[in-house]
Amino acid sequence: MGRTRKANVCRRLSRRALGFYARDAGVVQRTNLGILRALVCQESTKFKNVWTTHSKSPIAYERGRIYFDNYRCCVSSVASEPRKLYEMPKCSKSEKIEDALLWECPVGDILPDPSDYKSSLIALTAHNWLLRISATTGEVLEKIYLASYCKFRYLSWDTPQEVIAVKSAQNKGSAAARQAGTSPPVLLYLAVFRVLPFSLVGILEINKKVFENVTDATLSHGILIVMYSSGLVRLYSFQAIIEQFMQQKLDLGCACSQGGTTGTVGEAPFGIPCNVKITDSPPPLFEVSSLENAFQIGGHPWHYIITPNKKKQKGVFHICALKDNSLAKNGIQEMECCSLESDWIYFHPDASGRIIHVGPNQVKVLKLSEVENDSSQHQISEDFVIWAKREDRKENLITVTASGRVVKRNVSLLDDDPEQETFKIVDYEDELDLLSVVAVTQIDAEGKAHLDFHCNEYGTLLKSIPLVESWDVTYSHEVYFDRDLVLHIEQKPNRVFSCYVYQMVCDPGEEEEAVNRSG
């Protein structure tokens, strides 16, 4: 068969205007994103640094919005210059927002208020208030006072866009108690809510008397994950815990009595009492031992990734079947590299069941498949590898002995040698189906970085974008690629934060040539 020609962007736009893709909304959306991907990756397209700003407080990014001053000020990243969407009133240090999640309206749901159909920011303040804020105006739409018996600090999705978990800081006890060798029985609390409108699932305490040498706990997809100092990780059904150990059902806005005090649930100063207290160790759904409690689940069918619980095994990853703990064929992955920084591995966020393994000079995309003639066993194989652009060179060290003899020694450089191109960040842009890879090279005194876009299916390099600012490898960096936007957030010493915004533009040089030709 002959090679299939791809329709160019102009032809696809013309066909869309004539209604060729109008049979369902999904087709139109995919067509639009296909057109945008073609524009992003074409050779003439450039990404220009349109503005840069600096701040003394952390900078956050969520879906086209940049947040400054602990989420108090919101700026659009779409405009070619900073355009303020809103600024909330100044507040005291105790009222500042410490963590936030962006909530977006579910498709097809009937909601109680017109404002509910617009995006909201779910925010946690330093003084334990949970807020729902309009992402458009900054207006506070809902507020809940959590409690005074602990300090809540972290927000995460249990079920994305449906259920949130609010996690407290760990209770270390007083300095005097620590010196005496005693510690409080409750390590931390987890408050769980359904969103829009807020409704309480429950507040759970993680008690050392039940979980013994517990070091941390979190909630994800209805699973309570408990980590222990021995490296053990145990998974429990959160729903089963709620059904067995909930002491009383609490509803926000309703009267409640607790410990001789009466108040309204979710209002200050009463807050929300802890109403889920585990008294006996529940049966775990699953348990495994892993170095530093590192544990991930993913793939089709379900597999998990761990590092054997021995220090000398650091950098060795085992991929095992969840159903019977059997090691996949070729399931031991170890990147042969000599570097100061560890390589890392995770399940691909594109829901393909693949695995991404990142080292200083290579990005391996691995696939999980059935073993031929044995459907009960699965194997790991390479799908593709992205290599850093490097010279194969060795350092010659010359030593002169006491007798005057010259001795040459060849010493191989580290794989994350700063003078060689090194991978620092790997991410996935789901709408355009592109892998984005940040590579950094130290040139003289400063580092230079570029962001590369690779085909998610084959790993082919489609586009490379140089970042104009220098890249110091000792600083903390975040890079976001969102449709036609690239955002680089950098944290420098002394809590100085910088934000560099790049937008997709046509090459001005090519525009001038086109004008000259037309004249």
Swiss-Prot record:
Membrane topology summary: Multi-pass membrane protein
Subunit structure: Interacts with DDB1, CUL4A and CUL4B.
One CC-aspect GO term: cytosol
Intracellular or extracellular location(s): Membrane; Nucleus, Nucleolus
Keyword rRNA-binding appears in the UniProt entry: no
Domain of life per record: Eukaryota
Any Pfam family: DCAF17
Pathway assigned to this chain's UniProt record: Protein modification; protein ubiquitination
Functional summary from the UniProt entry: May function as a substrate receptor for CUL4-DDB1 E3 ubiquitin-protein ligase complex.
UniProt keyword annotations, A-Z: Membrane, Nucleus, Transmembrane, Transmembrane helix, Ubl conjugation pathway
Stretches that traverse the bilayer: 186-206, 222-242
Protein name as it appears in the record: DDB1- and CUL4-associated factor 17
Gene Ontology BP terms: acrosome assembly; cell morphogenesis; protein ubiquitination; spermatogenesis
Taxonomic placement: Eukaryota, Metazoa, Chordata, Craniata, Vertebrata
Tissues where the protein occurs: Ubiquitously expressed in the embryo, with higher expression in brain, liver and skin tissues.
